[in-house]
UniProtKB/Swiss-Prot annotation:
GO molecular-function term, one example from the UniProt record: 2-oxo-4-hydroxy-4-carboxy-5-ureidoimidazoline decarboxylase activity
Annotated family: Belongs to the OHCU decarboxylase family.
Subcellular location: Peroxisome
Keyword Lyase applies: yes
Protein name: 2-oxo-4-hydroxy-4-carboxy-5-ureidoimidazoline decarboxylase
List of catalytic residues: H67 (proton donor)
Gene that specifies this protein: Urad
Catalytic activity: 5-hydroxy-2-oxo-4-ureido-2,5-dihydro-1H-imidazole-5-carboxylate + H(+) = (S)-allantoin + CO2
GO biological process: adenosine catabolic process; allantoin metabolic process; amide catabolic process; AMP catabolic process; dAMP catabolic process; deoxyadenosine catabolic process; deoxyguanosine catabolic process; deoxyinosine catabolic process
Residues noted as binding substrate in the record, renumbered to the chain: P68, S84, Q85, R86, E87, Q88, F119, V120, L121, A122, A123
Entry keyword set: Decarboxylase, Lyase, Peroxisome, Purine metabolism
UniProt-listed Pfam families: OHCU_decarbox (PF09349)
Length: 178
């Protein structure tokens, strides 16, 4: 999909296509649509990120709370979004043995208890061995620092999802704006 197509989308189509760039947060896509036209991937991405950055802390935490636990209940029940299912699968989290899954569930619960939102990590940039180590490491972080780190992971996930949608056109096709 190229940027000309993106810029020509009506509101409903744009939200349908980009509504899960930030996990379960179609409101962000709805707000970003109003910023058209976009000159390219980076411009579109910057509008998503600016929306996140402009939110008060409660809104930013809300975005984090929309993410599923890695290898958690949603995975076990088959209720992950298609994007999260694919990302967790690529990281090897859909095929953990029982001991690894239980360990990750325990760490996820400790993290959620400490910070008030689930552990967020760009799973596609990780693997099944790294996830629990990173979760244990981040459990030691201060809340303010961890909020920034988790939001950074949301942005990594969003970048990957936007790149997936825009494909080969994402880096090469730029639209000249009036």
């Amino acid at each position: 999909m190229d940027m000309v197509k993106v810029n020509s989308m009506d509101f409903g189509e744009f939200v349908d296509v980009f509504g899960n760039i930030v996990e379960k947060c179609p409101l962000i896509a709805a707000a970003v649509w109003s910023q058209r036209p976009f000159s390219g991937l980076e411009d579109l991405e910057n509008h998503f990120f600016a929306f996140i950055d402009a939110l008060p802390r409660s809104g930013q935490e809300g975005i984090l709370r929309c993410h599923p636990d890695l290898a958690g209940r949603d995975l076990q029940q088959g209720t992950l979004t298609a994007e999260s299912q694919r990302e967790q699968s690529q990281a090897g989290l859909t095929s953990l043995d029982t001991d690894d899954r239980l360990r990750l569930q325990q760490l996820n619960a400790q993290y959620r208890e400490r910070f008030g939102f689930p552990f967020v990590l760009a799973a596609r940039l990780s693997d099944r061995a790294t996830v629990p180590r990173e979760l244990a490491r981040r459990l030691q972080c201060q809340p303010e620092s961890e909020l920034r780190t988790a939001l950074g992971e949301v942005k990594k996930i969003s970048h990957l999802r936007l790149t997936d949608l825009l494909g080969a056109h994402s880096h090469s096709a730029r639209v000249e704006l009036p």
